[in-house]
Swiss-Prot record:
It comes from Caenorhabditis elegans. Residues 270-337, 340-397 are annotated as: 4 X approximate repeats. This is Calnexin. Disruption phenotype: Reduced fertility and slowed development. Temperature-sensitive reproduction defects. Glycosylation is important for its biological activity.
Length: 619
């Protein structure tokens, strides 16, 4: 019990400490808001510093959109049309520009911006050097900002296969790509695509393989209007990892964590194998020899009127069960030409309240004991049943044992091809390389600086997220955090409630016996009345002891000193005799306890103190 109490005290201490820390956070937030409102300074954007890679770095592509960048130089806008769609939406007529975001946090930091919504957009750029999937790790990284949020649309990159760089002006949805990577959202939740297009070396077909990923990523990346960093790393072993803002989102291996499986089955069903004409797959058939019984009447209804039923004695057939509401009034805007004749709504008839019913009484219906329904022949086992037919298995002529990078075509260009219902989507710092160190270095020089400045801008304009909002945003990315919050808040509260309001242990009475030996107070009557009743009983004792038939009090006659001395001596001798008699009746621990009744017969009766003992147990 002591350990439990200490545990509850410790939990309460942790909870109070957390609340105090939260209060400190909120106080700091309030101070910042107050300071911002009273002493608000104009936000001054920091100056953009161009990222620099080491001299040893040789990225395949890197564009941070420096000042002076224009559409048509590095990035070529598509002039193609989508196939198999209406002509009015077939064109890639979405507008692009290179510029600053609507809210500038870093002066001179530009990006590639989607300027229109509800249109098809396509734009592409040629890599400085092609990326061949051999022994090098593949890394693609970029940051994206949905300034207006995202209702429905993408924000992903397509790493175009070799040959696409020759005609970027005709880049479209059917242009071959090797990897597609990036965010996509339509509705309340989104996903971060990772799709590989892998070539079968046996038959030359190229198929899409989707990486397995979380089903509930949330909507924070699209709806918080902040910049987010997306990074993909694919290693020659087939291992891949997807991270957002430097934190792992999901990971796996091309050989085992894609859908469909990259390795084809060794055996397949023979498509030329056809089911024989006489193959019977019916396990049970109707018994043709069965005959409907003569007493089977299909015309009998399922229920019939209960002829034994009688009308209840309090059934009132003169009253209707429902009547027009007498308090209802026709609406003032009621037009009988348009709405028809107005009728008051029906309500329960108050005259029928408490009765079995009103209106015309009808006998209830019961199940018809003669009902059998439609007769059907029973089922019997099919003697010609051969089982479920399946085509025979043959060796898969297109089977191969894949190697992670063997079926990935070289990448020569990067493109953005998407439909979106939102505008002002900004792409920036697009990097394709074989060096994870380069991607980390670029992120430190670009994204993390931008993230810090965006937070500073939000705080200066009063748009920063509070403590609770950050908690909720975290659950969008990781819904399982709700369980953690409940465990951290609800369980301590329950523990504190049990500790504070749980069942209390009963106090040990101060008159409890410490041994089984008989004691002189075993025959005393327990306290059965409260203090107020004790006072009343005490007063009654005083009244009984008062002399005089009338109950009036008179002053006692004075006694001389000799009489007082004799009285005191007599009282002393009586007290000594009583104590000796009590000692005689005390049972030693090694002797059996005498019955209470026997002891009571031998004990002297004290009639004057009976009421007093009844009033208080311990006296």
């Amino acid at each position: 019990m002591v350990n439990r109490k200490w545990m509850y005290i410790f939990i309460q201490f942790l909870l109070v400490s957390s609340i105090r820390s939260d209060d400190d956070v909120f106080e700091d937030d309030e101070e910042e808001v107050t300071k911002g409102s009273d002493d608000k300074e104009e936000f001054v954007p920091s100056l953009f510093v161009a990222p620099k890679l080491s001299d040893k770095s040789t990225p395949n592509f890197f564009d941070y959109f420096p000042v002076g960048s224009k559409i048509g130089l590095t990035w070529i806008k598509s002039l193609a049309k989508k196939d198999d769609v209406d002509s009015d939406i077939a064109k890639y007529n979405g507008e692009w520009s290179i510029g600053a975001p609507t809210k500038v946090s870093i002066e001179g930091d530009l990006g590639l911006i989607v300027k229109t919504k509800a249109r098809h957009h396509a734009i592409a750029a040629k890599l400085n050097t092609p990326f061949a999937f051999d022994a090098n790790t593949f890394v693609v990284q970029y940051d994206i900002k949905f300034e207006e949020g995202q209702e429905c649309g993408g924000g992903y990159l397509k790493l175009l296969s070799e040959g696409a760089e020759k005609d970027l002006a005709n880049f479209q949805d059917k242009t071959a790509y090797t990897i597609m990577f990036g965010p996509d959202k339509c509705g309340a939740t989104g996903k971060v695509h990772l799709i590989f297009r892998y070539k079968n070396p046996i038959n030359g077909t190229i198929s899409e393989y989707h990486a397995n990923q979380p089903t509930t990523i949330g909507s924070t990346y699209w709806d918080d209007h902040n910049t987010h960093l997306f990074t993909l790393v694919v290693k020659p072993t087939g291992e891949y990892s997807v991270s957002v803002d430097g934190k792992s989102l999901y990971y796996g291996n091309m050989m085992s964590d894609v859908t469909p499986a990259l390795t084809p089955p060794k055996q397949i069903f023979d498509e030329t194998d056809l089911k024989p004409v006489d193959w019977d797959e019916r396990e049970n058939i109707e018994d043709e020899s069965a005959v409907k019984p003569d007493d089977w009447d299909e015309n009998e209804p399922q229920s019939v009127v209960d002829e034994a039923a009688t009308k209840p004695y309090d059934w009132n057939e003169e009253e209707n069960e429902l009547i027009a509401d007498p308090e209802a009034k026709k609406p003032q805007d009621w037009d009988e030409d348009m709405d028809g004749s107005w009728e008051a709504p029906l309500i329960d008839n108050p005259a029928c309240k408490g009765l079995s019913g009103c209106g015309t009484w009808k006998a209830p219906t019961i199940k018809n004991p003669k009902y059998k329904g439609k007769w059907i022949r029973p089922k019997i086992s099919n003697p010609a049943f051969k089982g479920k037919w399946t085509a025979r298995l043959i060796d898969n002529p297109n089977y191969f044992e894949p190697k992670p990078f063997a079926g990935l075509a070289p990448i020569t260009a990067v493109g953005i091809e998407m439909w979106t219902m939102s505008e002002n989507i900004l792409f920036d710092n697009i990097l394709i390389t074989s060096s994870e160190e380069d991607s980390s270095d670029v992120a430190k020089q670009t994204f993390y600086v931008k993230q810090k400045e965006e937070y500073r801008l939000a705080a200066a304009t009063g748009n920063g997220n509070g403590f609770f909002q950050q908690i909720i945003d975290a659950t969008n990315e990781k819904p399982w955090l709700w369980a953690v919050y409940i465990l951290c808040v609800l369980l301590p509260l329950v523990a504190i409630g049990v500790f504070c309001f749980g069942k209390q242990s009963k106090p040990t009475p101060n008159f409890a016996k410490k041994s089984d030996a008989y004691s002189a107070d075993d025959d005393r009557v327990p306290n059965l009345v409260d203090d107020d009743e004790e006072e009343i009983i005490g007063d009654e004792e005083d009244d009984v002891n008062q002399p005089g038939p009338s109950g009036s009090q008179s002053n006692p006659e004075p006694q001389d000193e000799e009489e007082n001395a004799e009285q005191q001596s007599a009282n002393s001798s009586q007290s000594s005799a009583a104590e000796e008699e009590d000692d005689e009746h005390v049972v030693p621990e090694n002797e059996p306890v005498k019955p209470t009744e026997e002891f009571a017969k031998k004990s002297p009766k004290n009639t004057g103190g009976a009421k007093r003992r009844t009033a208080r147990r311990g006296d």
